[in-house]
Amino acid sequence: SMLRNASPERHYDVIVLERNISAENKQNITDFLAQFGNATVRFYDVSRAIDGFNLTTNNAHISIETYYRFIIQEALPFYKKVLYLDCDMVVNGDVAELYDTDLGGNAIGAVPDIDFIGNLNMKDGICAEYAKHRLHMKNPYGYFQAGVLVMNLEKMREIHSVREWLEIAQQPGFIYNDQDILNMECEGSVTHLPYEWNVMHDCDGRVHGVCDFAPAHMFQEYMD
């Protein structure tokens, strides 16, 4: 979907972070992308980068692959800026426009996580307490969703080395794993993007029941 919406005037360098994609499937992906004259694909095996780290997740639907974001800055040493997309994204526009976002020197460009932000205002106070005492966020309403990221790799390298990122990831108590860590460590260096760049659809009726507990102006921006 990304390449079907790509601009013919731009080149798209697709880099797949992986550990165990078979040679056959790599060839299938390569052959598929060959139909697009302005795209190339490469595969980067992260096995050595994560070797020796005890990485786990707290959610059954989240795999160890979620930590691959932390490896990008080392895997692509000559890149200053990249666009990270979760592999399950459906793209309806030209991501080159998103890549061109001026981050103003910030480390991350990302869309606010309307679900998390709605949870901050729940009466039980669990999420608000977590954001304050575990993530130590000064402004938890700036919490972002990490499925789509414009990454300033130079700034990310200044914040932490890959080893430091992964050492933090080994610590217990993170609910949303690497997403929590990015929010905790990059707070104050985030450019918030329009919601249309990472639309969270209504799952289990959470739009009207969780998301609508977010501040009114934020929820309206999401709905628009």
Language-model-detected regions and their locations in the chain:
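Glycosyltransferase catalytic domains, chiefly GT-A lineage
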Residues: 1-224
